[in-house]
Swiss-Prot record:
Chief location of this protein within or outside the cell: plastid
Protein name: Large ribosomal subunit protein uL16c
MF terms in GO: rRNA binding; structural constituent of ribosome
Compartments where found: Plastid, Chloroplast
Source organism of this protein record: Coffea arabica
CDD domains: Ribosomal_L16_L10e
Length: 135
C-alpha cells in the first residue's frame, strides 16, 4: 500500500474539496487515462486495488502510471470510546481527488485493451470516472 515515508506532522485537518482540479488534469505519460468526475478521498487500498486490476488485465503488454498519491492521514477513534480526550490516531492514508484529476494512465496497448482494463479499475473507485484518450 502507498503511504509517505515521513511527514512533517502526524495529523491533519479534514479540509474541504472545493472546485475543480487545475493540477494533474492532463495526460502526461501514456495515451489513455482514467479521469475523476467527482470529488472524493481515495484510500491507498482503493488505489492499489485499481492498479492491480489494470496490471492483471494488461499482463506484459503496456505500462501503467499511477498519478495520485495518498498523502493525507485519516484518524479514527476506537469503537465505544467517550467523547473528548483528543483526536484519534492515524488509521489509513487517502489521496484528495477533485473533479478533472487523472487517476491512472496507460500506454503501449491498443485502445480496446486499455478501455477494458481501465473500466475494471474504474469499478474499484468510489466515484464516477471517465476514460479519456490523448490527442
Amino acid at each position: 500500500m502507498l503511504s509517505p515515508k515521513r511527514t512533517r506532522f502526524r495529523k491533519q485537518h479534514r479540509g474541504r474539496m472545493k472546485g475543480i482540479s487545475y493540477r494533474g488534469n492532463r495526460i502526461c505519460f501514456g495515451k489513455f487515462a482514467l479521469q475523476a468526475l467527482e470529488p472524493a478521498w481515495i484510500t491507498s487500498r482503493q488505489i492499489e486495488a485499481g492498479r492491480r486490476a489494470m496490471t492483471r488485465n494488461v499482463r506484459r503488454g503496456g505500462k501503467i502510471w499511477v498519478r495520485i498519491f495518498p498523502d493525507k492521514p485519516i484518524t479514527a477513534r476506537p469503537a465505544e470510546t467517550r467523547m473528548g480526550s483528543g483526536k484519534g490516531s492515524p488509521e489509513y492514508w487517502v489521496a484528495v481527488v477533485k473533479p478533472g484529476r487523472i487517476l491512472y494512465e496507460m500506454g503501449g496497448v491498443t485502445e480496446h485493451i486499455a478501455r477494458r482494463a481501465i473500466s475494471i479499475a474504474a469499478s474499484k473507485m468510489p466515484i464516477r470516472t471517465q476514460f479519456i484518450i490523448s490527442r
